[in-house]
Swiss-Prot record:
Sumoylated with SUMO1 on multiple lysine residues. Phosphorylated by HIPK1 upon glucose deprivation. Changing R251A: Abolishes interaction with histones H3 and H4. One of its GO terms (molecular function) is nuclear androgen receptor binding. Changing Y222E: Abolishes interaction with histone H3.3. This is Death domain-associated protein 6. Residues 626-740 are annotated as: Interaction with SPOP. There is a cross-link at K142 (Glycyl lysine isopeptide (Lys-Gly) (interchain with G-Cter in SUMO2)).
Length: 740
């Protein structure tokens, strides 16, 4: 009897004889009495006679004893889980009787029992191992009936028929196994002979010289060698199956790659199973690794977010790819070559001892390099030619596109399509056409900007010329004003306009006088903005005044108040070259200003009295003036100094005496409605050089005749005012468009 710690030597003959014994499996209570089992176990030996000698080992009793000891150990260690012992007992009952009486099961029980006693903390590991072994050797359901019938028939005294019925079955199994073993041996011998034949043929094909002309031949030596190697691999696999051994040869590519790249063991096991699965050496892609990570996370409920799973899969894919590449590279290095290179040593070169071989190698090397240079130069020239042709085609295509785009912009604009749309239809390459169209549009925009700059420069030059001409004609205008005022003084006309002129002259302060030269310098040095000053001429009130050649009297307009900025009326002025109707009615020889200055009227606000084209005058009188308004920033610079609340725009009225010795400047006081007169904002002036913003279609005098003084005058009687919104002539034509 072998003990638990003894080494058991396996013998195939003993195992076969032990397997040939009927050895019915007894239940656990019967196994506890070895005295009762001795007669039953000795009966088959006595029946077999000489075939069953006393020296033959029987492991059935020993296995039952070891199993009982393991169950007792499990009862003591697994008191918290009483279901473990019945589970092990059921597994042992389901196992095959031949396996229970085998030396393999004895070795397994001895090893498990010794390890469980030495390391009780891992008892469940050993229990699982034993259960796995018993499950692998469990008998089928139809075979479980025989032990049950045997146990049920034993107490009835029918033991000899039972043994007789079991002996033929075992004999048939033994007879069927023996020819199968002999047949497998014949197959193994035949396969080994075939493998030797394949190896010899492969060696012969490897030693054969391979010509370049045989590469396209389906029966070349290289292809024959490849086919024989595939057959050799299949034969080797079949031979390993017959011999019941592993087919691993120890190559690097067959080694298992352990993976511990992540902190989750479940994910590591899944990835390791993916990269080490049997079959062809397939390199997994990122999708395979990501699916493996997602399956592991879903199955084990790791609760990882999608982004973390993706990052983990990316890192794992990089690590796995590097490991697989290294393994494949090492396998190529170790298995490269054939039997001809087995005896090669790096320090042994036959060319060192054979000069003829060395010369032949040098010639072959020079020939190979020359042929390689010829091939490279040939295809380099072809590449240069193709690139040059492509360059010419591209250049011609670009030229055709540019010419087409230059011809079609006008038609495309007329048809409502942009130049880019036409170019994209005419050119096969949309991207190049769009690039050309963008260049054309940029060039057109640059040309338009240059034209606008030229127009602005021309406008500025024309305005400067107009100012110079107006300043030159200042002297003539002043002389004409003197003559007209003298004639008006002699005339006995009692019109409201004449009375206003007389009252204005009486209220003048004689001390406010300046020299003519200083007035001219002041007018020339100051640029009067049309958006800040607003004037309207006083036309003659009767036909007698027109016949006397009276010049319309100028009255000043005060600054616009903040209340007057609510509504503004913008009326386009007449061209510079067009003479006004007042000029034609008064005198054809008299010359008016060439550029009218503008202002904006507010609807309903009182303005300076203005005689319309039909000669009607609307007299209105007001009392004291209202509070002064603030000045704009631009007007502050022009007026020089003075308090903000009392400053206003003054009219310079020059009275030239007949001897031409002095000029009298007559400032006009602010009126309540004049303070409400709006001043046109500088941003409302039109860009056209020949048009401006005016309050009415009446003629406006030259701005050179305007002046500003830093002091204010006391209020005087109100003047006649009229509004352009209520006193416009119905026959007057007012142009409201900015276009030419």
């Amino acid at each position: 009897m072998a003990t638990a710690n003894s080494i058991i030597v396996l013998d195939d003959d003993d195992e076969d004889e032990a397997a040939a014994q009927p050895g019915p499996s007894h239940p656990l209570p019967n196994a506890a009495s070895p005295g009762a089992e001795a007669p039953s176990s000795s009966e088959p030996h006595g029946a077999r006679g000489s075939s069953s000698s006393g020296g033959k080992k029987c492991y059935k009793l020993e296995n039952e004893k070891l199993f009982e000891e393991f169950l007792e150990l499990c009862k003591m260690q697994t008191a918290d889980h009483p279901e473990v012992v019945p589970f092990l007992y059921n597994r042992q009952q389901r196992a095959h009787s031949l396996f229970l009486a085998s030396a393999e099961f004895c070795n397994i029980l001895s090893r498990v029992l010794s390890r469980a006693r030495s390391r009780p903390a891992k008892l469940y590991v050993y229990i699982n191992e034993l259960c796995t072994v018993l499950k692998a050797h469990s008998a089928k359901k139809k075979l479980n009936l025989a032990p049950a019938a045997t146990t049920s028939n034993e107490p009835s005294g029918n033991n000899p028929p039972t043994h007789l019925s079991l002996d033929p079955t075992n004999a048939e199994n033994t007879a069927s196994q023996s020819p199968r073993t002999r047949g497998s041996r014949r197959q193994i011998q035949r396969l080994e002979q075939l493998l030797a034949l394949y190896v010899a043929e492969i060696r012969r094909l490897q030693e054969k010289e391979l010509d370049l002309s045989e590469l396209d031949d389906p029966d070349s030596a290289y292809l024959q060698e490849a086919r024989l190697k595939r057959k050799l691999i299949r034969l080797f696999g079949r031979l390993c199956e017959l011999k019941d051994c592993s087919s691993l040869t120890g190559r690097v590519i067959e080694q298992r790659i352990p993976y511990r790249g992540t902190r989750y063991p479940e994910v590591n096991r899944r990835i390791e199973r993916l990269i080490n699965k049997p079959g062809p050496d397939t390199f997994p892609d990122y999708g395979d690794v990501l699916r493996a990570v997602e399956k592991a996370a879903a199955r084990h409920s790791l609760g990882l977010p999608r982004q973390q799973l993706q990052l983990m899969a990316q890192d794992a894919f990089r690590d796995v790819g590097i490991r697989l590449q290294e393994r494949r590279h090492l396998d190529l290095i170790y298995n490269f070559g054939c039997h001809l290179t087995d005896d090669y040593r790096p320090g042994v070169d036959p060319a060192l001892s054979d000069p003829v071989l060395a010369r032949r190698l040098r010639e072959n090397r020079s020939l190979a390099m020359s042929r390689l240079d010829e091939v490279i130069s040939k295809y380099a020239m072809l590449q240069d030619k193709s690139e040059e042709g492509e360059r010419k085609k591209r250049r011609a295509r670009l030229q055709g596109t540019s010419s087409h785009s230059a011809d079609t912009p006008e038609a495309s604009l007329d048809s409502g399509e942009g130049p880019s749309g036409m170019a994209s239809q005419g050119c096969p390459s949309a991207s190049r056409a769009e690039t050309d169209d963008e260049d054309d549009e940029e060039s057109d925009e640059e040309e338009e900007e240059e034209e606008e700059e030229e127009e602005e420069e021309a406008t500025d030059s024309e305005e400067e010329e107009d100012l110079e001409q107006m300043q030159e004609g200042q002297e003539d205008d002043e002389e004409e004003d003197e003559e007209e005022e003298a004639a008006a003084g002699k005339d006995g006309d009692k019109s409201p306009m004449s009375s206003l002129q007389i009252s204005n002259e009486k209220n003048l302060e004689p001390g406010k006088q300046i020299s003519r030269s200083s007035g001219e310098q002041q007018n020339k040095g100051r640029i009067v903005s049309p958006s800040l000053l607003s004037e309207e001429p006083l036309a003659p009130s009767s036909i007698d005044a027109e016949s006397n050649g009276e010049q319309p009297e100028e009255l000043t307009l005060e600054e616009e108040s903040p209340v007057s900025q609510l509504f503004e009326l913008e009326i386009e002025a007449l061209p510079l070259d067009t003479p006004s109707s007042v000029e034609t009615d008064i005198s054809s020889s008299r010359k008016q200003s060439e550029e009218p200055f503008t202002t904006v009227l507010e609807n309903g606000a009182g303005m300076v009295s203005s005689t319309s084209f039909n000669g009607g005058v609307s007299p209105h009188n007001w009392g004291d003036s209202g509070p002064p308004c603030k000045k704009s920033r631009k007007e502050k610079k022009q007026t020089g100094s003075g308090p903000l609340g009392n400053s206003y725009v003054e009219r310079q009225r020059s009275v030239h005496e007949k001897n031409g010795k002095k000029i009298c400047t007559l400032p006009s006081p602010p009126s309540p409605l004049a303070s409400l007169a709006p001043v046109a904002d500088s941003s409302t002036r039109v860009d056209s050089p020949s048009h401006g913003l005016v309050t009415s279609s009446l003629c406006i005098p030259s701005p050179a005749r305007l002046s500003q003084t830093p002091h204010s005058q006391p209020p005087r009687p109100g003047t006649c005012k009229t509004s352009v919104a209520t006193q416009c002539d119905p026959e007057e034509i007012i142009v409201l468009s900015d276009s030419d």
